[in-house]
A protein has these predicted regions:
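Conserved hydrophobic/aromatic beta-strand scaffold that supports enzyme active sites
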Residues: 41-45, 63, 81, 89-91, ...
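Ligand-binding loop in jelly-roll beta-barrel domains
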Residues: 86, 94-120
């Protein structure tokens, strides 16, 4: 079959470590259920006021698409703050320091897609408290 469909009920949610002092996040891998070979895809759930771990991925570029809630992402060094509402997206190029956050009072649900399909070579860097909005 030249396509695969992954329904919401097919997702297997797993807890993932968050930044220090924040509640764990959840991810649902889509790469294998969708039989992707050249890229990686995941759904993410961030509880209110949760931060992912700040990191640099030297090889993978990623696209983040918020489906529910506002996705806040800190990019570059020094970091700049970008807020993305549902209907928008942010593309992060390889080698860019980044940290995804949910600074809202409701759960953030977003889709993340990256290529190439490499995993495990990100470098984690120091967390930051806040950053100015991007100009």
């Amino acid at each position: 079959m030249p396509f695969d469909v992954v329904q919401a009920d097919d997702l297997q949610w797993e807890k993932r470590e968050a930044a220090d002092g924040t509640e764990p996040r959840q991810q649902a891998p889509i790469t294998e259920p969708a039989k992707l070979t050249q890229s990686r895809a995941r759904m993410w759930r961030y509880p209110p006021h949760t931060r992912g771990r700040r990191h640099i991925d030297p090889d993978q570029e990623e696209v983040f698409v918020p489906l529910r809630g506002t996705l806040t992402i800190l990019l570059e060094d020094p970091p700049q703050r970008i807020d993305v509402a549902p209907g928008g997206l942010v593309a992060v190029h390889s080698g860019t320091p980044m940290q995804v956050r949910n600074e809202g009072d409701e759960e953030l649900l977003f889709f993340a897609y990256g290529a190439p399909a490499v995993h495990g070579n990100a470098t984690f860097v120091d967390d930051v408290v806040d950053a100015p909005p991007a100009s």
